[in-house]
Design a protein with these regions (language model features):
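Flavin-dependent oxidoreductase catalytic core characteristic
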Residues: 1-290
Length: 290
């Protein structure tokens, strides 16, 4: 851009051909890293995150290639092709988020208990990057160039997968019970003590449900042993208290946990007449007031 503003054809050609060489080298590198799965690329000396650094390097190269080719072929019209430019923006954002996650993990001392969180986040980002890049190529206006781009960016096809259910379970296990990793993750976020606040109620429900687990275990054991003969949760718990399986305090503790749990899972639960008065025309509201 500087060369274009100067009255020097030599400087312009130097910058122009330098950029062409850069794009061609990115094309070759993108194809090679796609074939090899980015294996062999330099990365920080940490086996737990090595492959993620390599994959993000591969996608950074592919992104530079797609952005350069898009500008070269589409030019100023790229800003009017909003879905195409938005996908390029998605890739850039996801690369940035992936870099932040890796840097965050590295600077906090590469704590092993945070690895499931990092793994899930990077699998998710990598898959979404793949989807966005595939969308760019699928909708590229110049189809012959799109054909070439697909061979350069995805020489082995779409090989990345979404985070597996097992990864999700590992993350959930960290988040649904108190742990050092969970405490570090939520440090500094808004977390009120008020149970009338949705976030505060969620935190209170977690602690209440965990505290009630040993009590529930005693009731289940009594039921399995045939000591409880009633049906229905409420009746069984009342019977368990009468038989001294649990104390009155434990029964109250279980009921509180059950109530909090019920409130948390009842999403989009509104009164039957919620909003009816506001939705009614003004003349109907006036008649109702009379």
């Amino acid at each position: 851009m500087k060369a274009a503003g100067e009255d020097s054809l030599d400087k312009f050609y130097e910058a122009f051909w330098g950029h062409i060489k850069f794009t061609l080298s990115n094309a070759a590198r993108s194809m090679w890293t796609g074939i090899t799965g980015a294996r062999g690329l330099p990365s920080p000396a940490c086996e737990d995150t090595k492959r993620y650094y390599q994959q993000m390097t591969r996608f950074s190269t592919a992104f530079a290639l797609l952005a350069d080719v898009s500008m070269f072929v589409i030019g100023g019209s790229l800003k009017r092709k909003e879905k195409l430019s938005a996908r390029l923006g998605d890739v850039l954002s996801l690369l940035y988020l992936s870099s932040c996650a890796l840097k965050f993990y590295d600077q906090r001392g590469r704590l092993k208990d945070e690895l499931p969180l990092l793994r899930w986040a990077l699998y998710d980002c990598a898959f979404k990057i793949q989807v966005a890049m595939n969308g760019i190529i699928d909708n590229f206006p110049n189809r012959p160039i799109a054909f070439v781009l697909r061979r350069l960016v995805f020489p082995r096809g779409l090989t990345l997968i979404q985070p597996t259910d097992q990864m999700g379970h590992e993350v959930a296990d960290l988040l649904i019970q108190p742990s050092a990793a969970r405490s570090r993750l939520i440090a500094g976020i808004y977390l009120p003590d008020d149970e009338n606040d949705v976030i505060g109620k969620l935190e209170a429900a977690m602690h209440a449900v965990i505290a009630a687990e040993p009590i529930e275990a005693k009731v289940r054991a009594a039921k399995k042993a045939g000591r409880l003969t009633t049906h229905g949760a409420e009746a069984q718990w009342d019977e368990a208290m009468k038989l001294s399986v649990i104390t009155e305090t434990e029964l109250a503790q279980w009921k509180r946990a059950r109530a909090l749990q019920h409130d948390i899972i009842m999403v989009d639960d509104f009164d039957l007449h919620f909003g009816k008065q506001v939705a009614a025309p003004a003349w109907q509201q006036a008649e109702a007031a009379e």
